[in-house]
């Protein structure tokens, strides 16, 4: 249960990272 909560938080952080990585080709997250 605790792991699931951590995963959700990481997913939220990843969403922010994706938004900030639109113009950076080196970023592993991309805008969709």
Curated annotation (Swiss-Prot):
Domain of life (superkingdom): Eukaryota
The protein's name in its UniProt record: Alpha-conotoxin RgIA
UniProt site (Binds to the Pro-224 and Asp-225 of the rat nAChR CHRNA10 subunit): 26
Subcellular location per UniProt equals: Secreted
The record places propeptide residues at 1-19
User: Which species expresses this protein natively?
Assistant: Conus regius
Instruction: Name the GO cellular-component terms.
Output: extracellular region; host cell postsynaptic membrane
Q: What is known of its domains?
A: The cysteine framework is I (CC-C-C). Alpha4/3 pattern.
What does the UniProt record report as the effect of altering residue 24 to E in this chain?
Answer: 783-fold and 8.3-fold less potent to inhibit rat CHRNA9-CHRNA10 and CHRNA7 nAChR, respectively
């Amino acid at each position: 249960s605790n792991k699931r909560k951590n995963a959700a938080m990481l997913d939220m952080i990843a969403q922010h990272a994706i938004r900030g990585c639109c113009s950076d080709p080196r970023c592993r997250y991309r805008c969709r």
